[in-house]
Amino acid sequence: MRMDMLVRDINVFNSYFKRFIKGNAAIKDGKFYYIGERELDAFEPDRIVDGQGKYMVPGLIDIHLHIESTMVTPATFSYGLIKNGVTTIVPEPHEMANVFGISGVKEMIKASQDCVADMFYAIPSSVPATSMETTGGSIEIDDIDELMQTEDIICLGEIMNYYEVITDPDCKTNKILSHIRSRYPNLIIEGHVPKLLDLDLQKIINAGVNSDHTHQTVEGMDARIAAGMFIEIQEKSMTEEVIDYLKENQVDEHFCFVTDDVMTDSFQNRGHLNVLLKKAVQMGMTPEKAIYACTYTPAQRMRMHDRGAIAPGKTADFLLLSDLETFEIEQVYKKGELVYESARPYVQEMKEEQFPEHFYQSVKLAELTENDFNITIPESLESSKCRIINVQNGSTFTSETHDRIEGKEGQLSWEESPYGLIATFERYGKNGNRAHGLITGDVLKRGAVATTYSHDNHNLLVIGHNKQDMMIAANEVIRKQGGVCCVHDGKVLSMIPLPVGGILSEEPMDIVSKQVQHLTDALKSLGYEHYNVIMSLSTLSLPVSPALKITDHGLINVNEGKTVPLMMSDEA
């Protein structure tokens, strides 16, 4: 019997027993044909790979991530995935959808077609994430119907505005969920439900949302699994308590590991989903259980029954490892073809621009002046009690503090205060909205930074301690049609150009990685103390992440789902 390939003398991971079994693997037409002890006596392989006792595990599968968080194109992202053993992903392009609507989703899918890694897409469900921001595009019910006609769609992406879902039966997202339940009753619906417990948690499950990838605690996981919810565990949730819970309880079918957002420098220097797998093992989880949570359970969650296991009829995506402790990848195979080998050079083949011309002209803002960073108050007012965003290290959550800020000649004297200014400017040419706030905590203490990479609306966000630096940073980003720029004493310290929709670079991974690291170092030199400064910066405009954020509509009290004024009454 002729086979395309026989991999002999290997320890094969059996997903159904969650253990390794010594044997051989025959592959035909990109699929596993036989796993067992037979070899040359039964098969006539075109190629023979001597496994030399190595470990064969399925290609890793990441079912919750956003390519745009890495600031690179799908082709560059795929290049990074393969060398880290990730052969299948489910990206949710709500960042590009916020900029361009359905065309953003379609172009991301199109750009993924020739990638080595398989990409099955989630339809962005919450674009915009709330009604309290202006975006370049939106995803409506008609758009969902249109996208459902493509074979690349596998689920409805994370329902982010959970507060509206459980409090407002007539909100847009509830209409989308009702439409999905009626027209596509078998479609998987992904969730984003931080801190929900008890009745509120079960309300969101009743709405059809049955997974959560946000920060997990033991209490939260226990409640979710008990209610039938699937848990997608990011690295930030991998505490000792969480890993111990997963080790000690029979919940293997109810969780998997996901990356969600990976910055380019981390992707380049640390890795991807393989990082979480190795970390779980280092924290005491058995290699078999960790592999299972990165292969079989994510495949089952997304009903990708053709992969996630090494068994007859399954897609022949697999890795060869020399040991299970370090999880060092020696070879990666995609549909039975060798696509990466650690002993050989691995160079990305760059392509010409992949997106329509208007994707490179998305920042529709005139250059700013210092006056754009003024906060006007009544001339008779000598000071005002103000809300202040407090940035907390180690979290994208913020808190709200209050202080009295002096005023002079009808302007709030924020430059003389101990606080920075945070301002956002609508950049799609729709309404000219702008909003100002004050900021403190583990954020930059001098200079300025401006960015169009600002979740999820991706308007121009500027933070600084003086108007001149803020103006220079903002205008540099406007001139480059998007990016992140850091300025101090009138000089540009670092810049990441992001010309595709103001959020993506077409440079190769190693170049963008160096740019991200340089910008990170620059921001830290100005006092930004967060462990992931770019992620912290970009989520200050995310109105579904507690507690006080800012959009072009104003300051947002996330927990109450409403805008609140910067200046407060003395009685407040």
Predicted regions and their residues:
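Active-site microenvironment of metallo-dependent hydrolases
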Residues: 1-23, 27-33, 38, 82-83, ...
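Structural motif
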Residues: 4-5, 46-47, 87-89, 117-120, ...
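Metal-associated gating/positioning segment near the N- to mid-region
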Residues: 38, 42-43, 48-114, 468
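Active-site neighborhood of phospho(di)ester-bond hydrolases with catalytic His/Asp-centered motifs
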Residues: 57-64, 91-94, 122, 157, ...
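Divalent-metal coordination cores built from histidine and acidic residues
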Residues: 78-188, 492-497
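Short, ordered loop/turn segments at secondary-structure junctions
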Residues: 93-96, 124-125, 161, 194-195, ...
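Short acidic, glycine/serine/threonine-rich loops at helix termini
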Residues: 100-104, 130-136, 167-171, 200-204, ...
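Histidine/acidic residue-rich metal-binding segments in metalloenzymes
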Residues: 138-157, 164-257, 268-282, 289
